[in-house]
Regions:
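Extended amphipathic alpha-helical segments enriched in small hydrophobics
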Residues: 305-349
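Signature of N6-adenine DNA methyltransferases within the class I
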Residues: 1-188, 209, 223-227, 238, ...
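Amphipathic alpha-helical
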Residues: 197, 201-224
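Ligand-binding pocket scaffold of soluble enzyme catalytic domains
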Residues: 230
Length: 349
């Protein structure tokens, strides 16, 4: 949008100003008759992204989604934009809508056959029936129709924010100077000038990816602090959980050992009870949590606020024991290779 249109939209469609397509949806409400229907094809970004939260809430108050087909990024030949086609019933509340999800069929020639297949066979696996009011229970009200029916109620119970605190982050502002791999540093200097450092990385559930160390000398700490780059000093030495901020696949949660520091690329949460951390990690590494995160923020970044908004089941002794076993197994596997500082020999030797 140019400046003139941007200013006009801001004045006339305040809660839809982020995109012209949402402005057109709002305009559709103005043009429709009472209890009329509005049908459009738009980009699908408004369904999930946080900047459209107020727009979604307004839409759900004013209407129900009676049907929707969410197409893949390459749903049309020559177009690389995820789109959605939908019908809104203006003034209706509590209507159960029919949703078809074609995201996994990322070819133009697959869109129509898979949509027709879903209509012929509701048990195909990509057709869902959901009431629009269910979305209001999920933080941010995303149009997450693929979640199990009633799963939004879980967000009304205990959340991760009830047991975890954000531990901040370390920002060196010059990683080339202040970061090293652990094998580049004398072991005599580890724990004094150099501290172990969680720094994001690839996919690894439960444990691992602890390659890095950070300069933690008095001079380095002063430098980080001068740029606002120090973590929560009351929490940073405690054990917790962390994950990689940026991921192109699934988010993986793992242990942040006590006395390990962490970067902004490895968001970290601390609970007052270490058992709560281990138990929560079992849920966070589950397929259900993956579906929740996909609903809350279907982008490449998984932020602290995304995780704090997740539901958190009560601690269960059986789950706790299984989670500890998973951690031990992954740690043993990690220590079987030279990248681990606890490596002794390859298991095949």
């Amino acid at each position: 949008m140019n400046k003139w249109i941007s200013a006009w939209v801001k004045n006339n469609y305040a809660n839809a100003k982020r995109d012209l397509c949402t402005c057109f949806i709002n305009r559709g409400f103005n043009l429709s008759n009472d209890h009329g229907y509005i049908s459009m094809i738009t980009a699908s970004s408004w369904m999930f992204i946080s900047s459209f939260e107020e727009f979604r809430k307004s839409l759900l108050r004013r209407s129900s989604i009676t049907s929707m087909i969410q197409q893949s990024t390459h749903g049309y030949a020559g177009v690389t934009v995820p789109t959605t086609m939908f019908v809104l019933a203006e003034g209706a509340q509590g209507v159960t809508g029919t949703y078809i999800r074609l995201e996994d069929f990322d070819r133009p020639q697959w869109q129509e056959p898979r949509a027709l297949e879903a209509l012929a066979d509701p048990d195909c696996g990509w057709l869902y029936c959901r009431a629009a009011l269910d979305f209001a229970d999920i933080p941010g009200a995303p149009i997450a129709y693929w979640l199990p029916a009633g799963s939004g109620k879980a967000f009304l119970e205990r959340r991760c924010a009830d047991i975890f605190q954000s531990a901040g982050r370390t920002k060196t502002h010059n990683n080339e100077v202040y970061l090293r791999k652990w094998w580049e540093i004398s072991t005599a200097k580890l724990g004094a000038k150099w501290r172990r450092y969680c720094n994001g990385g690839g996919f690894s559930k439960w444990a691992g990816l602890d390659y890095d160390v950070v300069n933690w000398s008095t001079e380095a700490i002063a430098e980080y602090g001068s740029h606002g780059g120090l973590p929560n000093m009351d929490l940073c030495d405690k054990s917790g959980l962390c994950w990689g901020l940026i991921t192109s696949s699934k988010t993986s949660f793992r242990v942040k050992p006590a006395n390990y520091l962490y970067s902004s690329g490895s968001p970290t949460l601390i609970a007052s009870n270490p058992e709560e951390t281990i138990s929560a990690m079992a849920f966070l590494n589950s397929s259900l949590c993956e579906a929740y995160l996909d609903a809350l923020n279907p982008t490449l970044n998984t932020t602290v606020n995304d995780v704090l908004a997740l539901p958190c089941p009560d601690t269960d002794a059986g789950v706790l024991a299984s989670a500890r076993q998973c951690i031990n197994l992954v740690e043993d596997d990690w220590d079987s290779f030279e990248a681990s500082s606890s490596f002794r020999r390859h298991p095949l030797l």
